[in-house]
A protein has these predicted regions:
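Terminal RNA-binding accessory module
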Residues: 2, 89-167, 171
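Rossmann-like S-adenosyl-L-methionine
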Residues: 38, 49, 57, 65, ...
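Internal alpha/beta scaffold segment
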Residues: 252-294, 312-334, 340
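Extended interfacial segments that mediate partner engagement and assembly in macromolecular machines
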Residues: 156-167, 174-285
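Residue-level recognition of short, solvent-exposed, well-ordered loop/turn junctions
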Residues: 133-134, 224, 390
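Short, acidic/hydrophobic/Gly-rich beta-strand patch recurrent on exposed beta strands
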Residues: 118-123, 243-246, 529
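Short, aliphatic-rich beta-strand segments
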Residues: 299-311, 363-367
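Basic Arg/Gly/Lys-rich low-complexity intrinsically disordered segments
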Residues: 1-112, 176, 181
Length: 533
């Protein structure tokens, strides 16, 4: 039988709660404000939040719980343990993880890297090996692996190179300051020239084969050439010592007998160490900001300048009197530096004893002025740049430092540097020597150079390049000035190559001269002569 209500919509069923009135404490009633006693400003806290903890609840502190040790840790060894079977188990070969096992490979060293390390390849991946020379076959233990390269050290020399020699330094394996000390000096010059060619080929579009790259100018005596040192003072082996920290470690290498430093500096460092230890001096404490932090020694001719970087307590008068009494010391200074940054000249130097300036040739140099690291090669640099300049050319020099090279050139020169003390020394030397064709300007080097190139037409521009290289503003200023002659001086091969890449569309590279300013290291001082196309 068919239903009569089939296909008809049913009436909506009424809720059983529709006839109820809203509660006074409900959200609906409160929003309507039906009761004045339940307005927002008169409503009190809910009773749930006012509940007090049970008084009869006895909560013991955590420390009062008696923790019993687990029985698993108290198990005694089995009395029926079979030692024979254990020995048989130990005799079986075990599998160690890759982290605990270091790999060894025999490789051929192809070339030198920019830091003096040997470069080889394992399965087409590059590996950098310390104390390895080109054309050597060595056994290498891999210390580090990444996706792009590997690091390792030599465990055995299978076929040593003919260029290898004894480093003749007790601290060579720990210091790493002279990365090429194990190579003959003549071979060092050859490999540095090849390294320069590789860098130019990598970063520029120049035809390296067609460039006039002169052989590297070396030193007559490639030992004891460093005339300035700056070392931390630290407590080591029961006494105060000066030295350098090893690369990527916190281990100290003593530097009072370094073959790269002058013999006068080495002997003076030993005497200063003895004086500091005899007076029970303390090294720098970063927490209390007290103690001796750094020692700076500079040799200018036969004169020796000594400067201390200390904490808030300075340095005692007894120590300064004993150091000043040394025959070779001509000036003694100190400065305070308690910041985390190792800035030697943060607050300026205070003179304790001696002269305010040191005499170098015909020039006077103050303690805060830029100092010459290798005087022999600095003189060679001045001669090479003088040979590239025409005496009639008007020159703008960037980054002149204390202006010693500019003062020795015969050209009319405007020189710029950001060190105000160096510019002051250069200006005073020019006045004293009555050199009217020299002008020294203090300020931001790139900004001042752009200003002078815009307002005056110069014949030549000397750029003493920094690690940052050439900025876009300076490149634009050089382009708009139309200057015809450029001379770039740089200590960094990669930075120099990138700068030449920026200039190669406007200038031709005439000559590249390399000076071995720091023997036994992979660094060179490079002079590039460019002429506008």
């Amino acid at each position: 039988m068919a239903r009569e209500d089939f296909g008809k919509s049913k009436p909506r069923r009424k809720s059983f709660n529709s006839d109820r009135k809203p509660r006074k404490d409900s959200r609906k009633g409160f929003n309507k404000g039906s009761d004045k006693g339940y307005k927002k400003e008169n409503r009190g806290p809910r009773k749930d939040f006012d509940r007090k903890p049970r008084r009869d609840f006895d909560r013991k502190p955590r420390k009062d719980f008696d923790k019993k040790p687990r029985r698993d840790f108290d198990r005694k060894p089995r009395e029926d343990f079979d030692k024979k079977s254990a020995r048989e188990f130990d005799s079986k070969p075990r599998r160690f993880s890759s982290k605990s096992r270091k790999e060894r490979e025999e490789i051929n060293i192809k070339k030198l890297g920019i830091n003096g390390e040997g470069i080889g390849y394992i399965k087409k991946k590059v590996i950098f090996v310390q104390n390895a020379l080109p054309l050597e076959m060595v056994e290498v233990e891999i210390d580090k692996k990444t996706q792009t390269y590997m690091l390792g050290h030599v465990t055995a020399y299978k076929k040593p190179s003919s260029a290898r020699k004894d480093p003749e330094c007790d601290q060579y394996n720990q210091c790493m300051g002279c990365a090429l000390k194990h190579m003959n000096y003549a071979d060092q010059l050859v490999h540095k020239r090849e390294l320069l060619k590789e860098t130019l080929h990598k970063y520029t579009d120049l035809s390296v084969k067609d460039l006039d790259i002169k052989p590297v100018v070396g030193m007559k005596e490639p030992e004891h050439y460093r005339h300035i040192v700056a070392f931390p003072i630290t407590y080591f082996s029961g006494k105060l010592c000066v030295g350098v920290y090893q690369r990527e470690t916190k281990f100290l290498t003593l530097m009072d007998h370094c073959p790269l430093q002058t013999q006068k500096i080495n002997s003076l460092l030993v005497k200063i160490e003895d004086i500091l230890n005899a007076n029970n001096c303390r090294d720098y404490n970063d927490k209390f900001k007290k103690g001796l932090r750094f020692l700076i020694v500079r040799q200018i001719g036969e004169e020796m300048q000594v400067a201390f970087v200390t904490g808030q307590d300075g340095i005692s008068q007894t120590v300064t009197k004993e150091i000043a009494a040394l025959d070779e010391v001509t000036a003694l200074y100190y400065t305070v530096n308690t910041s985390r940054y190792q800035d030697f000249y943060e607050q300026g130097f205070k003179r304790i004893y001696g002269q305010t300036h040191a005499q170098y040739k015909d020039f006077k140099i103050s303690v805060r002025s830029d100092m010459i690291l290798n005087p022999e090669m600095d003189d060679e640099k001045t001669r090479q740049i003088a040979s590239l300049l025409d005496k009639k050319e008007e020159v703008l020099s960037m980054g002149c430092g204390s202006g010693i090279m500019e003062l020795q050139l015969e050209n009319k020169i405007v020189a710029i540097d950001d060190n105000k003390v160096s510019i002051h020394d250069a200006t005073e030397n020019a006045k004293r020597l009555e050199l009217d064709n020299k002008l020294f300007v203090a300020g931001h080097v790139n900004d001042q150079a752009a200003h002078h190139l815009k307002n005056h037409r110069y014949d030549a521009l000397i750029i003493n390049e920094t690690v940052d290289g050439m900025t876009e503003d300076l490149l634009k200023s050089i382009t708009l000035s139309g200057i015809k002659h450029l001379i770039i001086v740089s200590d960094n091969m990669s930075t120099l190559a990138k700068t030449l890449h920026q200039l190669e569309e406007m200038y031709d590279v005439n000559t590249i001269i390399s000076l071995d300013k720091e023997p036994h290291t992979p660094r060179l001082e490079i002079i590039v002569d460019l002429k506008r196309k």
